A protein has these predicted regions:
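N-terminal intrinsically disordered/low-complexity leader segments
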Residues: 1-17, 87-94
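Amphipathic alpha-helical segments used for helix-helix packing
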Residues: 113-135, 186-194
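Amphipathic alpha-helical packing segments from all-alpha helical-bundle domains
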Residues: 95, 131-164, 171-175, 203-214
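Amphipathic C-terminal alpha-helical segment
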Residues: 111, 154, 158, 178-196, ...
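Base-recognition residues in the alpha-helical recognition helix of bacterial helix-turn-helix
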Residues: 55-59
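Append "Primarily bacterial transcriptional regulators
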Residues: 41-46, 54
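Alpha-helical structural segments
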Residues: 17, 21-28, 32, 46, ...
Length: 217
């Protein structure tokens, strides 16, 4: 009589699937617990594979967390682009440019509220060894056009092209706008504004975006 061998988790991974499976498990840990929850040994256990098998794909926790950070950044960018794509193609060029900037900020805050664990992980660069001192260079050289900061930069470039923002006031606005929406996002998920209800949070968001828009002129 032939005994049928049960399939183990290790049996199911082949042709490079293990790397993606490890990343998927790590993303789920980050989603529920933020960057501190991403531990290579835990991910290896979830996948049901040996330490050596996991280390062939991610040499240490920093490598795994770096991959999750890139994933989280990409999802944040997706949320911003979704808001941008919803901006109606009507009104003056100047109005559309301002509306697109507001949409970018709204998408950023939307993501923080919907995915706080991934949002925190998107900024865990110090734990991965990635340099974060110059976000402009990171956006241009490491991850290309689909990066949250690059998306923000383009919407601000559109403001200059539309005549809303004078070129001599362009420098530094990327970082200022980013600081504003990131700061509010952090207050919403980790700070004293975390207890505010959804309606109150949206009101505060609207006021912040109003202030940014007024400051452009």
């Amino acid at each position: 009589m032939t005994t049928r061998r049960s399939r183990t988790a290790t049996d199911t991974y082949h042709h490079g699937n293990l790397r993606q499976a490890l990343l998927d498990h790590a993303v789920e840990l980050a989603r529920t617990g933020g960057p501190d929850a991403v531990v290579l040994r835990d991910v290896q256990r979830m996948a049901g594979v040996s330490n050596s098998a996991a280390y062939r794909h991610y040499s240490d926790r920093g490598a795994l967390l770096g991959a999750v950070t890139e994933y989280a950044e990409s999802r944040l960018a997706d949320a911003m682009v979704a808001r941008l794509n919803a901006v109606p193609e009507k009104g003056t060029k100047a109005k559309r440019a301002v509306d697109r900037l507001r949409a970018t900020g709204q998408g950023y805050i939307d993501f923080a509220l919907a995915e706080p664990g991934l949002f925190r992980t998107a900024f865990a660069h110090t734990e991965t060894g990635r340099d974060t001192h110059d976000r402009r260079e990171i956006a241009k050289s490491e991850v290309g056009e689909h990066h949250p900061f690059q998306i923000l930069m383009r919407t601000i470039d559109d403001l200059v092209a539309a005549g809303v923002l004078s070129p001599d006031r362009r420098d530094g606005l990327d970082e200022a706008a980013w600081a504003a929406v990131h700061g509010l996002s952090t207050l919403f998920i980790d700070g004293p504004l975390s207890e505010a209800d959804a309606q109150r949070k949206q009101l505060i968001t609207d006021r912040l975006l109003d202030a940014i828009a007024v400051g452009l002129r």
